[in-house]
Amino acid sequence: KSGETLFKTQSVSKLIAQIAMHKQETVNKIYDPAAGSGSLLLQAKKHFDNHIIEEGFFGQEINHTTYNLARMNMFLHNVNYDKFNIKLGNTLLDPHFGEDRPFDAIVSNPPYSVKWIGSDDTTLINDERFAPAGVLAPKSKADFAFVLHALNYLSSKGRAAIVCFPGIFYRGGAEQKIRQYLVDNNYVETVISLAPNLFFGTSISVNILVLSKHKTEGKTQFIDASKLFKSETNTNVLTDAHIEQIMTLFDTKED
């Protein structure tokens, strides 16, 4: 079962890695704030020869077992121990790598709609990651806290590609205010809607949110890739041809 899960996300991981690294001849380092077993970071390694990622791979993971797995995974894929730095802890409340900022490439599939302390911790609204938006992600849905965290860690030339549930794009309240902040500051480069059933344990169609700090036009690109999939037993997959199609569109900046 777990092997199937891994395979299922492989194609999406490939797409995320390509987006984050798109047209960057070199990136200083690549970071995943919710690293899991390290699969997104390793997918980036697979796609780009080592020399392009100059200072290596960084990630933080909250679950002890998964954190150990991520470190083992790095060794198994021949990433030299001085080329990766995976830390254990809660990214939202106890973030590591502040001194390693900024990152040229950020990839992430953070947990969907998890609870967090949010406004119950009065210091968080003054945290440099969350303060600019003027409001915290709701306590019942930390999704945008991960997004704002990633944005804060992103370099001016870089790009972040984050897997998100569709709800964060249309719900009101604090999430609406955070969306407004992101759009007003021209940080949202592209939103890609993917086909259903591409992702572990959920048949929901997820989206990829692409953040950038170097947009020259005040436009956001929307790509509807919901019809791009190949049906396999119990699951859908993105083929390399589909990924190429999405990347071509992404490059043109057409909707």
PLM feature segments, named:
Residues 3-108, 113-115, 120-124, 129-134, ...:
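Conserved S-adenosyl-L-methionine
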Residues 100-255:
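A conserved structural/catalytic subdomain of Rossmann-like adenosyl-cofactor enzymes
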